[in-house]
Amino acid sequence: MGLIKKVTHWSYDNLIDYLSVNPTRDEVTHYKVDPENESDESIIKLHTVKDFGSITCLDYSESEIGMIGVGEKNGYLRIFNISGQNSSSPASHAPVGLNANNETSMTNASGGKAAQAENIVGSVSNLKDTQGYPVSETNYDIRVRAKKQRCINSLGINTNGLIAMGLDRNKHDSSLQIWDMNYHDDSHETINPMFSYCTNESIVSLKFLNDTSVLAASTKFLKEIDVRSPNPIYQHPTRLTYDIKLNPFNDWQFSTYGDDGTLAIWDRRKLSDQASLGDLNVASPLLTFEKLVGSGAASRKYMNSCFRWSCVRNNEFATLHRGDTIKRWRLGYYCDSNRDIAADDDNEMNIENLFVSSVHDTNTMYDRVATFDYIPRSNNGTSLICMRQSGTIYRMPISEVCSKAILNNRNSLLLSNFENTEIDEIRVNNEHEKSNLENVKTILKNLSFEDLDVSEDYFPSGHDEPNNEIEYSELSEEENEGSNDVLDSKRGFELFWKPEKLLEKDISVIMRTRASLGYGLDPMNTVEMIDSSKNLQNNAYIRNTWRWIAIAKASVDDGTMVSGDLDLGYEGVIGIWNGINGISNQDRYRQETILSDKQLNKEMEKIIKLRRKNRDRNSPIANAAGSPKYVQRRLCLIISGWDLSRSDYEDKYNIIMKNGHYEKAAAWAVFFGDIPKAVEILGSAKKERLRLIATAIAGYLAYKDLPGNNAWRQQCRKMSSELDDPYLRVIFAFIADNDWWDILYEPAISLRERLGVALRFLNDTDLTTFLDRTSSTVIENGELEGLILTGITPNGIDLLQSYVNKTSDVQSAALISIFGSPRYFRDQRVDEWIQTYRDMLKSWELFSMRARFDVLRSKLSRTKTGVLTADIKPRQIYIQCQNCKQNINTPRTSSPSSAVSTSAGNYKNGEAYRRNNADYKKFNTGSSEAQAADEKPRHKYCCPHCGSSFPRCAICLMPLGTSNLPFVINGTQSRDPMQTEDSQDGANRELVSRKLKLNEWFSFCLSCNHGMHAGHAEEWFDRHNVCPTPGCTCQCNK
């Protein structure tokens, strides 16, 4: 088995030294590697020493550059300088200094690579000389053996010249022999050991820990030996003793393996602690990996296992498997809770508790890899140098996986590789269009549930549904024609799966873009925004949901869903259908009111009459007039938008046919029970196919009263399962069996359409079953359009929870839920969504949108009696009176606490004294006229507590806060002289009105305390720098 070993402390340039032993174990090669060059050209072969017997071990000196030791199976140890100009052949057997004329076995790269190798050798030697590093230019070659010649299993060289040999067992000679090369007699090939240990044992592995300590392992024991002591510091019985390797980042830890390939990681502190207690059975490895390096690993002991500690990252090692896979293991650790970590040194942290945090597999570039080692690169990067079983050396880069991946609040992805100080960023740079909410026209004046859209998300057969997902503008027309080929090609993969594209279409980016456009602050504006914005995930169900909310809000605002003590705002179909049970868990009526089913029906009838006022139409459910739930059914039809008259039918048909959707118009005619109208609609279509279908449907008029089965019914059933258009399918399904459930079971038909059919034609029992079953389905699936069924109620919150779990669209959930909570009910999930969305708006720095959201929430929480149910945070800034130091926005109070807080000067004023002194009010009860005068509202330009006038404006001398000023304060806002009030639209006029109102607000200088109207301050400091108050030299604008 071959060997590659990284050499430390030899190179003082930017190159790294490596020593290798070929798989046949008969030659040693010295390489230099450029760590920053990933090509195989970076591997430069400098020297190769051949003609060894069977190499069993190899080590090098960290202090003597070029000095290596090679142990052989025949018991000889050869020590020579591999970096010298000439490396001797082992056949000479000559001492140091006598082999200058011997033949050198050196293999250099041919051509330019050979010249490069020669330059490197010379440059490195000169560089070391100039920097003062000792370099031995003497070529030496020493061959020695133990007194009892036997196989050398392991070898170690420390920085002081001590050489340790681990030998096979011998009854009369020690197996661990340590000798000093500095005092060796070159005329003898037998060594004279200075220290000897482990008689009648076979040492299979050893490693110098420092100048005096060595870690040795026999086939049965692990031992730490201090050469200054005749006895080991400890010896631990174990069979996991082969190939000791120290952790380069923590020399307390080392690894070994056993004959069956089981790998163990040890901590010397743990072994020494147990030895000091006299208990050898308690000590155990920190981690054990069963058969990790393969069974029969001990038979490969003459080199080393396919195990390497990482020299780049702490707590990482790599293993080779099957010659084609390298696994990189990363360890984590946790400390004992009863130990004070701060008291430990950095190198002595309590890491006895290790665990595997992650494992990453890397496939080798070529198969039949025999061994490998790490190549450290700058910035904590790494690659691998590998040797195949043929002896070929090649370099393999490693694609670093991300140890940290964090998305920021703008959905840019930050990536960090391991402990790399550099951070990669995938930034989302797409700039979406901006929108001004004031420019979106609303049509809420006459909006009602009957105005729900008829288009929805239907696309007739033969037409492609527009894709609201990722738009691929890079595709040309030719590429569109061959889209299948593009998808299968590499270019197509890169095109459709760019990280930037994926991040742009992530829900967090979509939510941020929606928020910047004012999404959800006004339902009808939201519908218009969805229609005009092409870059968002504007699914039809989102649009239809917001349109229903807009109509429900208009009904709440104009009071058409309120009757007496009953408020059915934003209530869904199933809540109304279930009556008292449907609204019992909500605050729909006053708490002191006991509402019965009979009273509820009366209130619902009042709501129906109020909504049907000035509407002359017949009831669409005359066949259910005798039902005990007739009132609920009629109100459910209103809520769902299906309370239509005959004239409304015709308008709906014309709108749908104008859009070219004749199939849908015919299906709506069937939903209204008008089969002849459906035939007429399809017969008027331009497509011959639809006219033929109209002929087939016309057979219903002839066969509807015939009992039994016939060929026409069979053909209709067949077409109902074979046609692609869902509306044609339900038409044929219904006329074949005259069963409305065929329409209700069709999932391709929208929920609102199926709901309209059920409310019109099902009896009470079947309708209850349908509503319960459908509501359970939409809640479980998180179908947002199902809010028309559940309403914004506790059941609706369950639906929104499923929707959030499916889409992560917490924005829509928060904005929708505030229409019902906390006005009608409270739910902790709503509070969590609201807080999450507020935090998101703050992280996106959309503070104005967050303020609008808070204002909208407080408005929607106000009940019909004017009570705010939301927990509104109090204002943090207010204006206080300079006289009494109280908030001028709070109403005056007659409590004793207010009297205490009022300044002493106010008590001299008789009016203030009478108002605030409780004793005076107690005894002076006869002064009714004074009390009546005291209860009169004060002017807006004086303090409501003490009656002091507000400061006057330094420009106009009018008291600040005065309403209905006799002049207009324009401020410094520029206005187009050609633009008149008539030419401005409603939104601009409202904006100008708000600006003029803002110009009348208070404005104070914090230095001189002089005040002005905000608009007057703008006008004054647009031309001046000094305060307008006479005698004041304050520069207020600075």
From Swiss-Prot:
Primary location group: cytoplasm
Disulfide linkage: none
Annotated positions of the Phosphoserine modification: 123, 136
WD repeats: 50-90, 147-189, 235-276, 544-587
Record keywords, A-Z: Cytoplasm, Membrane, Phosphoprotein, Protein transport, Repeat, Transport, Vacuole, WD repeat
GO biological process: positive regulation of TORC1 signaling; protein transport; regulation of TORC1 signaling
Function, in words: Component of the SEA complex which coats the vacuolar membrane and is involved in intracellular trafficking, autophagy, response to nitrogen starvation, and amino acid biogenesis.
Quaternary data: Component of the SEA complex composed of at least IML1/SEA1, RTC1/SEA2, MTC5/SEA3, NPR2, NPR3, SEA4, SEC13 and SEH1.
Xref: PANTHER family: GATOR COMPLEX PROTEIN MIOS, WD40 DOMAIN-CONTAINING PROTEIN MIO FAMILY MEMBER
Name listed for the protein in its UniProt record: SEH-associated protein 4
Gene from which this protein is expressed: SEA4
